[in-house]
Amino acid sequence: SIVPLKHKWKVLLIFSYLFYFINSGKYIVFILFSTLSIYFGGLLLNKIDDGFSMAKKALPKENKKEFKSIIGWQKKCVCVSIVLLNLGILVYLKYSVFFGQVFCDLLSIFHIKISNPMQNMMLPLGISFYTLSAISYIVDVYRGKYKASDNLGKVALFLVFFPHIVEGPIGRFDLLGDQVYEGHPFDYKNATMGLQLVFWGLFKKIVIADRANMYVNQIFNFHDQYDGLYVIIGMLLYTLQLYAEFSGCMDIVRGSAQMFGIEMSENFARPFISKTVSEFWRR
């Protein structure tokens, strides 16, 4: 191996940030901010927990319950602050163009014409996915599912890992964190199986979804020219397109990760055969 096993995570982190910077440029600051917010927020939750563990030994029994509620309130404040901070950035970036245009339209009623100051705002790559992953991390730490990591590189790689930053799936730190950080020796079986999964995903995306999309657009854009049978066919093709699109992207993501020896959760496991709404959501 060219890179020692213990340093492979560093190469993966650099490559992931390079990939992100090429695709998002200056907007990389937002994922850096999210990373730092959950890292230091997690450490603060650890500190509160450790302080409680030490203090409760010296407290009288009658005061422990009150002290525990104070600690719980402090932890909740930290968790809610981090969640709102990350959600606020997501909402601002996703809807600033829309609300900016609404503001301009309202001013035009009073014959005040200005251009939308937010019209050139771009969305950072994968902001929805990494924001939800960041929130899942801080909420899990708050609930005591695991201790927050004191390794900034490990937390950073968990969020920016390049295969899942574009289309998900939304990662869980307890399932993905150690895998991306530990480093894996080259494995021929993983490499070939991962490559096969990538090609299968590309087949679904390019051959099935993109082809179905041509007919769907034709029928939906000119629906007045087609009778009921064609509309039904269009609906069925649209369902097929959605399935092939998302399933194909998930296969590409999982295959890319598998080539690095990393197993990612299947995020689109035949949802259309679900028997209940909750099962559909889980699949």
Regions picked out by a protein language model, each given a short descriptive name:
Residues S1-R283:
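Membrane-embedded transmembrane alpha-helical bundles that form the catalytic cores
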